[in-house]
Amino acid sequence: MSITTAAPRTDDGTARRIPLSYNQQFLRAFDKGETDGAFGHRHTLVCGWRVTGAVDTDALQCALDDVVERHEVLRTAVVGDDEGGHQVVHPPAPVALEVTDLPDADGTPRDVRAEEFLNDLDAAPYPVRELPHLRAFLGRFDTTDAVLVLATHHTSTDAWSLQVLMRDLVAAYRARAAGGTAEQGEAVQYREFARYQQENADSGRIDRARAYWRERLAGAEITGITSDRPAQADLPSAYGVHRFVFDAELSRKVVEFARAERCTPFMVLAAAYSVLLRRRTGTTDVVFPTFSSGRYEERFADSVGPFFNFVPIRIDTGDCTTLADVLDRSRAACVGAYRNEIPFARIAEDSPALLAPFADGFLAVVAFEVLQSAFPLDGEGGGEPAGPRFAEIRRRTLSQRVSSAIPDGGLWAMDVLPGGELAGSLKFDHNRFDERTARELVEQFRHLLTALSGAPQTPLAKL
């Protein structure tokens, strides 16, 4: 979604005003122009799929265009004005599809080269003003082995949305390759979600949740990590990614420990992360943001848009003596947070001090999330489809000096892979952090996770 000061016009000369969602309003607070911040050309989501089987590029082009026609948010602009902004839906336009040959040359394994191809595209800029907010790249090793990469702007999609897009794209591709069009029900559009939020802004459920958060976050600030260098207002961000995969034994222990403790893996990982923040900052009362899918009602499960929601997790470890105690606090904090989830913008209205670290040039807020794969495709376990098979490239091990960006701070993401491994990434601004610091944080986290899953009665004082 592009942000502009003048309402763009549709082909018939009209511009229908659609209200912004709370998340779109929140993103506007991090608007730093077209090259940085929430609407910058690197605030993007780029994902890749390994493709096995012959690809009909004409059918792929038609399928991409079908997806843009189906999901309005991919052709929507955010308009800034004195009334707080609005969004405008544009007519469908062709998706840019770039086809590249990836011939075998230096003996590098194809899996590695596929990841390199994905990383190169992840590092590229995609201006938010260019519609539609979807670009596709097909890298071909040969006629039956390829990599498909989809790039979107993060103000128009989220991680869940990309799974929906890919599912719909595969359905449209198979129909087009067979000479027809996909028979899919009408999509629920993101603008309907924005209206739903406005219509339910003062409901009883919202009021009860706001009361919960006011009490839960009383006196709290999001915990920031001291950066190696202070932020400089005139220096644009320079994000990179440190990637890692924990060994199979540790990954197995974490998953089994979570099951034994009647927790989700996220609760275990969040407990370890809270202890990491405690050790790095010296505070025992930590608050860190995570992300949810933001889809409060089932009817939005198949919708595309920036639904993702900032959810603050407060874990007070002040009177905890062991790692097991911290896990108990983590479980309770997570359950309470998700039971009372509302748009973060509403939480921030009632707890403005929560965001203070974002204005502190010496602190960086590092959000922590566990990725969700909502719609696994054939390559990850589904029947014998007609045509090529698609498997998402989730096990990524190659770090990037230059990557897609986030509006501010850092982002720590974990993923429980289909084979049980724990993979992760830490996205950080090179202007504020050294890569050595990122590696140290990951190693400290690994140490804490090992202790928590293997010896939960370990006293915190002995870590």
Mark where each language-model region is.
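A short, small/polar-residue-rich loop/turn motif at beta-strand boundaries
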Residues: S2-A15, T52-E69, V88-E130, E249, ...
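Active-site-proximal acidic secondary-structure segment that organizes catalysis
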Residues: R17-P19, P132-E192, A438-A451
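Extended, hydrophobic beta-loop-alpha segments that form or line the acyl/peptidyl-thioester binding
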Residues: H71, R75, M166, T284-F291, ...
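His-Asp-centered acyl/peptidyl-transfer active-site segments
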Residues: D11-R16, T35-T44, Q61, E72-V73, ...
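Acyl activation and transfer enzymes in specialized metabolism, enriched
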Residues: V51-R75, L150-R167, G240-G282, A301, ...
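Short amphipathic alpha-helices and their capping loops
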Residues: M1-D36, Q61-P109, F117, P132, ...
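Acyl/amide activation-and-transfer machinery of modular secondary-metabolite enzymes
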Residues: Q24-V51, D81-D106, E130-R135, D145-V147, ...
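Flexible, non-catalytic linker and terminal segments flanking ANL/adenylate-forming cores
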Residues: M1-L27, S373-G382, A423, R432-L463
